[in-house]
Amino acid sequence: MARRTTQLLIFLMLVGVKLFAQNQKEQLSQLMNSYHRYNMFDGAVLVADHGKVIYKEAFGLANREWNIPNTTDTKFMIGSISKPLTATLLLILVQKGLIKLDNKLEDYLPAFKNKPAAKVTIRQLLSHTSGMPNYDVIKDFFPRISRQSFTREEYINVYKDSTLAFEPGTRYMYSSWGYFTLGYIIEKVTGKSYEQVMKEEIFAPLGMANSGSYLHTKIIPKRASGYDYGLGNYYSADFRDQSNTMGTGDIFTTVEDLFKFHIALTNNTLLNKTLTDEMFTPGRRPARYGYGWFNQNFKYTATDSVKANYHLGSTEGFISFFLRMPETNSMVVILCNSAPTDFFGITKNLINVLHDKKVALKAPVHKSIETFIVNEGATRAVEEYKKMKKDTAHFYVDWLQMYYLSEKLYSLKRYEDARIIAENNAVEFPDRDYVALSLANIYLALNRKADAIQFYKKVLDLNPISEEAKNRLKELVVK
């Protein structure tokens, strides 16, 4: 293992030297090839600067069973990057006078009359300030609910009685249910399916011929399969029925089609300037979420940042990141069909190349300790983690990837290994509620209820509106 880590380190150091001897396109390609070589990226990437595509390339396999490679026109599921498209579509209907931003949910969907969310406005749903919870309010949502097929009405019934997390308009809380609701409103006011309206108003006018709404019964030519990667192996991703992701995560597309979408937003092709500006106006802190986009400065070095509109997306076996830099009409999009991946780190380095900055190609600690876990166990892996963490000249630590590592072990029911990694994560990243929640769930799986209660309480200290932590505590206290 030490030999492989050394090889990785030497390779990355050499790449860092070579980047500046090449032109920009070659630098971008060298960068992405290094990520792919060490199992950190499979998918497609596109970079545009001043309205022109300067680099696009694909890596890895679209289908591992048949050894079919990804290409730049491979279709990927984009998860929550569907939300910017939904927001744009809804604003097109606002522009046409079919929807009003300050109208209430009950005005469009009678099923919500006399329900907690009845008075929530369209504006609040768009900006995640409605107080409508996310699906983690339901225990074991993914194994119990996400794999089922629903009609629109049936899925609305799953959450329409949910208590709001706060008074609408007073706070920010991300809610995929909120965007499913917006998709349903689009269907109600047009009398057409969300898929059809999206095609008529956005995909067809922009020539986004490789984009659409996915359902598992469809045959979609050139659509990538989704995989999970961890501990040195690829796994076929879990199934999710996309009937419960309409408006929030059911879109498939390509990097080239998303470039067309970016240009249309830049040129006000779809929306007038007033609505476009409103969409990209920063919302409530901390997320600064406008309508379908996080609108805030994106920090790509310790001292440099750029004004950006961005969104990330994650769905079974896929992870994606779409970032616009409006001041220079530039963009970066990465679509990956092996999750997880360091989408923030990749994007930061792509922007570094765009701005002629030094590329920080360091060895990722989480990748190195994966091999230690496989070969020598989690305790040894944590010992090596502590050594590599100190070597900041050659290694970097990504809290999110360390969190994903504990979650992968948990999903494989390797609870003791998961506990060791998650306990280290809790010490290293004490302010991350996801990290505390991960450890609490692992303790619960190990029947260490007192420890689980302690960390569910910590989750609520960090994030008072965590519905999953609230629900778990209620169950544990009752028991």
Residue ranges: model-predicted function:
Residues 22-57, 187-192, 196-200, 204, ...:
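Catalytic loop of the DD-peptidase/beta-lactamase superfamily, centered on the K-T-G motif
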Residues 136-220, 243-259:
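Catalytic-site signature segments of enzymes, centered on catalytic residues
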